Amino acid sequence: MSAKEVIAQLKSFANLERKKINERFFKTGPGQYSEHDKFIGVRVPQIRLIAKQHFKQIDFSEIDQLIINPIHEVRFCALIILMNQYQANNQETVFNYYLDNISSVNNWDLVDTTVPAIIGDYLVNNSEKTVLLFKWANSDDLWERRIAIVATFAFIRQNQFKLTLAIGQLLLKDQEDLIHKAVGWMLREVYKKDINICMAFLRENYAQLPRTTLRYAIERMPEIDRKAYLKGTF
């Protein structure tokens, strides 16, 4: 399977109205976080289907052409292909390839869909490499910082919370709303596993918590607790 064939198949599902919706939803205007991105309007289920159909027949030389493509849906398909290959037990090779192409993981949906399944899962089983998360958390690149916190989702699923809290704390002073949301999301996932650990973190770091992070983190709390945290009266 060639990259050209995959791209042609994706383009066959292109939809102008969906393209316009995605351009607004992903904020592609001048100065916005997706200014670099181009959309053709392919729905995620269609992208997943194409990736599933071809991940066994496509090699890295063809994925090379997909993963650097300026079209968002093409890069997304490349990353889903990698995720499928990783889950088919090609783990170390896919992990290293993903690292080599991490600059192409440059929008929040690309991060959120594939990072826990590849980066996070690999690090759970190779803890000596978790230093990468701290490197990314201190990066000037928005997407690397989001990768750092979202990768810890794989650890949360294993009831391991230390990395989430450590990376989350590093990112509390971040200026980007997309980081505030990601940290809050991961804290909410911690809350679903261990209420006390999450609440202790919120109390200890309350003065530094961006409001968006707090709102995301407390979504699952009973109303009385949510109000207390919003008012700082816990």
Which residues does each PLM region occupy?
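Alpha-helical scaffold domains
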Residues: 1-234
